[in-house]
Curated annotation (Swiss-Prot):
Keyword Isomerase in annotation: yes
Protein name: Chaperonin GroEL 1
Role according to the record: Together with its co-chaperonin GroES, plays an essential role in assisting protein folding. The GroEL-GroES system forms a nano-cage that allows encapsulation of the non-native substrate proteins and provides a physical environment optimized to promote and accelerate protein folding.
GO molecular function, one term: ATP binding
Record gene name: groEL1
Subcellular location per the Swiss-Prot or TrEMBL entry: Cytoplasm
SUPFAM superfamilies the record matches: GroEL apical domain-like, GroEL equatorial domain-like, GroEL-intermediate domain like
Reactions performed catalytically: ATP + H2O + a folded polypeptide = ADP + phosphate + an unfolded polypeptide
Length: 550
């Protein structure tokens, strides 16, 4: 085990705080409508330009190990917020930095870190309740477009496209973002289905960067039971190899010899293949397999109806234009099923929904209906250069995540106003323990950080903006950084999803409170480079050359 370098107390916190500041300062320049871009060097290919907080955070690695630990903890805030809400990563980073800074000052002044943490948690709970109380549901397509526009950095066409896509496939529908070959950004609605089963082996992956399996113009084998032996599969595998098309196997499970053979074939390039477990359980699994069979124009291979795996022909397999599989989900796009068959199945499910008395069954039937009838919307992002397309794609993905979050938990006034107004709820909390109260006050001050940063990125003094907003009694009064005017945020369409604001604060406070309570840091000592081999000593006996008159 290699030797470790250990830092304690103030020294540890100072180094950690430096790392937090370096990462947060790089991320927070992107906040708000007048936030700037960050240019990131890539080891190969053109540099990447982005305004997405989590993308910037993930690229930062520092030389000093103690500073790097602080930066990595803050990176965790951005990643967690991105995973849960899909947007709000920069806001979360700004909040975390503000809480860590104030917390470090309080600890240096001799306050108890554990009491500070308790105070931070009490205040955050009050803010979350306040945000949930203020949130109002998204009522119209226009409001969905507003949320998308704000998250896409004021790009109204993107907001409209997302609203259009959601209208077509429903709020629960599947929307994916792809790069377009042309200059235009457009929405394409494709019939399709998504279910929550990922690939059975990572060896099936075709796109190593995204860790996904992508199969085009694919055959789909649907089997009701487990597939474990190879012999029964050979006839259909040989037929698929001759056709030159990829194959997706959906079965109760694929294991043992069958899975091993498929993996070996995939690695040797003989057969482009992937396998996933069938979605659902019991009777519901069978019903979902039948749904997929109808959608893809295939036949469910089931011994109940007298079809064995050995006798399967290509005609019995389903077809789809594209299948995308990641670790957790499978999306089938452009199934070759006949329209009348799909329509008949939809009507059948609708009839079952009306007949059932169980809420759980009704919910599951509605899920199946959405998958069959909803389809998949694809937003194809275009641009003049690859760099521009990637930057725009980041913004579209953020906007899409924000609109989904808005549909789930409603919207609040944007531009940091919801957090600023929540100060009133925190101000009402009083605790007899002075250190717990100091923790509450840390959050009280941190709630101003996002709006200050938005104002400062727009070239306006943050304190003046905060003062003006707090003077006004209207709950929706705020600062429009785009026009540098004070407006009614809801009337102007400057809104944030309540889920994004809530998640940003919860993740920021959770990690920041842990950093504040840190008393020691341990890192590996850098290894000393091995000494170089000594140089050649010259040939012995050559020392008497001095008299040669050189």
């Amino acid at each position: 085990m290699s030797a470790k370098d250990v830092k304690f107390g103030g020294d540890a916190r100072d180094r950690m705080l430096r790392g937090v500041d370096i990462l947060a300062n790089a991320v927070k320049v992107t906040l708000g409508p007048k936030g700037r871009n960050v240019l990131i060097e890539k080891s190969f290919g053109a540099p990447r330009i982005t305004k997405d907080g989590v993308t910037v955070a993930k690229e930062i690695e520092l030389d000093d190990k103690f500073e790097n630990m602080g930066a990595q903890m803050l990176r965790e805030v951005a990643s967690k917020t991105n995973d849960l809400a899909g947007d709000g990563t920069t806001t979360a980073t700004v909040l975390a930095q503000a809480i860590v800074r104030e917390g470090a000052k309080s600890v240096a002044a001799g306050m108890n870190p554990m009491d500070l943490r308790r105070g931070i948690e009490i205040a955050v709970q009050a803010v979350v309740k306040d945000i949930q109380k203020r949130a109002r549901p998204v009522a119209s397509s226009a409001e969905i477009a507003q949320v998308g526009t704000i998250s896409a950095n004021g790009d109204a066409p993107i907001g409209k496209m997302i609203a259009q896509a959601m209208q077509k496939v429903g709020n629960e529908g599947v929307i994916t973002v792809e790069e377009n070959k042309s200059l235009e950004t457009e929405v394409d609605i494709v019939e399709g289905m998504k279910f929550d089963r990922g690939y059975l082996s990572p060896y099936f992956v075709t796109n190593a960067e995204k860790m996904t399996v992508e199969l085009d113009d694919v055959y789909i084998l649907l089997h009701e039971k487990k597939v474990s032996g190879l012999q029964s599969m050979l006839p259909v595998l040989e037929a698929v190899v001759q056709s030159g098309k990829p194959l997706l196997i959906i079965a109760e499970d694929v294991e043992g010899e069958a899975l091993a053979t498929l993996v070996v074939n995939r690695l040797r390039g003989g057969l482009k293949v992937s396998a996933v477990k069938a979605p659902g359980f019991g009777d519901r699994r069978k019903a979902m397999l039948e749904d997929i069979a109808i959608l893809t124009g295939g036949q469910l291979i089931s011994e109940e109806i007298g079809i064995k795996l050995e006798s399967v022909t290509l005609k019995m397999l389903g077809r789809a234009k594209k299948v995308v599989i990641d670790k957790e989900n499978t999306t089938i796009v452009g199934g070759a099923g006949k329209k009348p068959d799909i329509e008949a199945r939809v009507q059948q499910i609708k009839a079952q929904i009306e007949e059932t008395s169980s809420d759980y069954d009704r919910e599951k039937l509605q899920e199946r209906l959405a998958k069959l009838a909803g389809g998949v919307a694809v937003i194809r992002v275009g641009g003049a250069t690859e760099v521009e397309v990637k930057e725009k794609k980041d913004r579209v993905e953020d906007a899409l995540n924000a609109t989904r979050a808005a549909v789930q938990e409603g919207i609040v006034p944007g531009g940091g106003v919801a957090l600023l107004r929540a100060k009133k709820a925190v101000g009402r909390i009083h605790n007899d323990n002075a250190d717990v109260q100091a923790g509450i006050n840390i959050v009280l001050k941190a709630l101003e950080a996002p709006i200050r940063q938005i104002a400062e990125n727009a070239g306006v003094e943050g304190s003046i903006v905060v003062g003006k907003i707090l003077e006004n009694k209207s709950e929706t009064f705020g600062f429009d950084a785009q026009t540098e005017d004070y407006v009614d945020m809801l009337a102007k369409g400057i809104v944030d999803p309540a889920k994004v604001v809530r998640t940003a604060l919860q993740d920021a406070s959770s990690v920041a409170a842990l950093l504040v309570t840190t008393e020691a840091m341990v890192a590996e000592l850098p290894k000393e480079a091995a000494p170089a081999m000594p140089g050649g000593g010259g040939m012995g006996g050559m020392g008497g050359m001095g008299g040669m008159g050189f």
